Structures are given as C-alpha cells and as structure tokens.
C-alpha cells in the first residue's frame, strides 16, 4: 500500500515530463489561395490579367493587386463588386466605373447597372483572377458575382483562376432556407 502513492507520483511525473510536439503558429497557419503565389504566378506571367477584388483581397497586410504588380504581373483592369474595389461604397449604393487613384488601373464596377463583364470588358484580358472573401451567408453577393464571372469567361473563351479562401464560420451552417419568391441575382 505504501508503494501506491509512489507509483502514482512516478506515473504523473512521467507524463508531465514526456516530450510533446509543440505546435507553432506557422504550423497552424491557414493558407489562402492568394498566399500560395508559387503555384499561380507562373500561370499569370506574360498574360493580361484582370482581377475581381475588394479590400479582403490580401496577402498578409498587402493588397493582392499591389503584391502582383511588384512581382511583374500585368494587371490590365480590376472588376469591383458590391461596396467597390476599395470598399468605400455603402451597401446597396450604385458603384460607378473609375480609375483607381492608387494604381492607375481601370476599375469596372460589377454592382449597379452592370453585374457581368461585357465582351468589350474582356477583350484585352487573357485571364481573370477571382479573390474575394465570402462569409457563407446567402445575402452576400460575392457568390453570385463569381457565377456571373464564370459565365462571362466561358462565353468569351477566357481563362479564370479562383483563389479560394476558407469560410470564416467553418463548418457551422444555420439560418432559414430561402423562400424562392424572394430570390434575386
């Protein structure tokens, strides 16, 4: 009976002192499609690139457009979703075409009077890059914008590359099912 506390203590100390693999922040880091530049930049080199982008289109703290330009990618235009390329438009407000004051790149709005690129919009484009964060809610317009961009690329014989981002809600799905009489987009 006097050995039991000693055995229990030895057992406890064994597991307290056992070497464990300590997970580092780097091992736990989630990589988005945009983060994996070595996989997609070779596909963009020498091509005229359009990108569907907004403020969520980042690699770390740098906007993907800035990052790609620094790497020599020829970005010929940006397509802007709801809220605009720089995110300075309120929800539901018409967003006009413009020239981005930071990069000088033409920005074509796909929210408001036009929701899909025209043949003319894609005439000087070889490949369209899509990188928008979605939140997994049906009222978010990004998934509808993606579907229309895919249609436009197919109709005009253009390549499209989608840089995926994980759903921040993970595996949680909740909420009412859409009543089809309220469907839009």
Regions of interest found by a model, annotated:
Residues 1-27:
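Bacterial Sec-dependent N-terminal signal peptides
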Residues 74-84:
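Short internal beta-strands
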Residues 25, 83-104:
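N-terminal beta-loop-helix "entrance" segment that forms/cooperates
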Residues 95-125, 137:
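Glycine-rich oxoanion-binding loops at beta->alpha junctions
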Residues 73, 155-159:
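A short helix->loop->beta-strand "cap" motif at the edges of active sites that frequently abuts
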Residues 134-146:
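Glycine/threonine-rich flexible loop motifs
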Residues 87-92, 161-184:
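Glycine-rich, charge-decorated loop segments at or immediately adjacent to ligand/cofactor-binding or catalytic sites
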């Amino acid at each position: 009976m006097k050995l039991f506390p000693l055995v229990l203590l030895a057992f406890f100390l064994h597991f307290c002192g056992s070497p464990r693999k300590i997970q580092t922040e780097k091992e736990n880091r989630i990589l988005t499609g945009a983060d994996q530049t070595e996989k997609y930049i070779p596909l963009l080199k020498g091509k005229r690139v359009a990108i569907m982008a907004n403020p969520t289109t980042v690699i770390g703290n740098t906007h993907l457009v800035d990052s790609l330009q620094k790497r020599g990618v020829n970005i010929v235009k940006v397509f802007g979703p709801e809220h605009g390329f720089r995110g300075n438009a309120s929800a539901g407000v018409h967003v006009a075409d413009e020239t981005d004051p930071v990069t000088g790149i033409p920005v074509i709005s796909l929210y408001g009077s036009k929701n899909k690129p025209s043949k003319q919009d894609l005439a000087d484009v070889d490949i369209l890059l899509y990188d928008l964060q979605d939140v997994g809610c049906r009222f978010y317009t990004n998934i509808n914008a993606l579907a229309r961009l895919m249609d436009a690329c197919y109709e005009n014989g253009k390549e499209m590359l989608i840089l995926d981002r994980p759903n921040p809600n993970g595996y949680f799905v909740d909420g009412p099912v859409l009543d089809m009489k309220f469907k839009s987009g």
